[in-house]
A protein has these predicted regions:
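Conserved ABC transporter NBD signature motif
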Residues: 21-32, 36-37
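Helix-to-loop junction immediately C-terminal to a conserved catalytic motif
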Residues: 13
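Helix N-cap at the start of a conserved alpha-helix in ABC-type nucleotide-binding domains
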Residues: 125-127
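Catalytic Walker B motif of ABC-type/P-loop ATPase nucleotide-binding domains
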Residues: 114-118, 123
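ABC transporter nucleotide-binding domain
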Residues: 131-216
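Conserved ABC nucleotide-binding domain
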Residues: 72-94
Length: 238
């Protein structure tokens, strides 16, 4: 289901026209002709379209030519970390390697603001961890990272604040620690005392089937197990 994450990012980047509202970056309204702000942004779209007939090296050379400052050293650092072959043609790159190239293009000019749309899709688990380390490095420099993902584990690893979008509307913005306190895990218990357990825990039953009940739990697991220890339970699934 399309929630509006990519549309929001494309709107921020002035790739599509906004129907209402405005985008402020560094307390300044950002429009498509503002070169000064654009140079501070590293953008990674969810789908990457580049010049297929170029090699990786030629694409990076072309991108580097737009910047007056020396970014060659940073470019080489990123190539080494992400293990990308510069000799390959873009049309021959796998989805994972194309994503690596997109990451390098977004990061190599040392931007102060990173706007990343589903950046880990296509990366294997090892490269995902390399990417997370890159983000932590950028964060330690005081740079801003605007990150779109539907993977909740990434949110907890990376983010300080979380904005939740539903049906194209931003419905909530919270600090990650506050959101974590409210997060639920679903528990299924099979017991002849299941109704009594639900009443004792003060939970709402999501579904039930005979002696089995499913409910949302926000207690730490050790505390939940301690509360359940006084009951005879045939089966528990967390």
């Amino acid at each position: 289901m399309e929630l509006g994450k990519s549309t929001t990012i494309r709107s921020i980047m002035n790739l599509i026209n906004k129907t209402s509202g405005k985008v402020l970056i560094e307390n300044k309204e950002f429009d498509k002709d503002d070169i000064e702000i654009k140079e501070k942004i590293g953008y990674l779209p969810s789908e990457i379209y580049l010049y297929d007939d170029l090699t990786v090296k030629e694409m990076l050379d072309y991108h580097e030519s737009f910047y007056k400052k020396d970014i060659h050293k940073r470019r080489n650092e990123l190539i080494k970390k992400l293990e990308l072959d510069e000799k390959k043609k873009i049309e021959d790159l796998s989805l994972g390697n194309l994503k690596k190239l997109g990451i390098i293009l977004a990061f190599m000019h040392k931007p102060k603001i990173l706007i990343l749309d589903e950046p880990t899709s296509g990366l294997d688990p090892i490269m995902q961890n390399v990417f997370y380390d890159l983000l932590k490095e950028e964060k330690s420099k005081g740079n801003t990272i605007f990150y779109s993902t539907h993977i909740l584990s990434e949110v907890s690893k990376i983010c300080d604040r979380v904005g939740i979008i539903k049906d194209g509307n931003l419905i909530k913005v919270e600090k990650i620690e506050d959101l974590s306190k409210k997060s639920l895990t679903f528990v299924t218990i099979t017991s002849e005392q299941s109704k009594e357990i639900a009443k004792d825990l003060k939970v709402n039953i999501v579904s039930e089937d005979g002696n089995a009940i499913k409910f949302g739990n926000n207690l730490p697991h050790d505390e939940l197990i301690k509360k359940l220890s006084k009951y005879k339970i045939d089966r528990i699934l967390i």
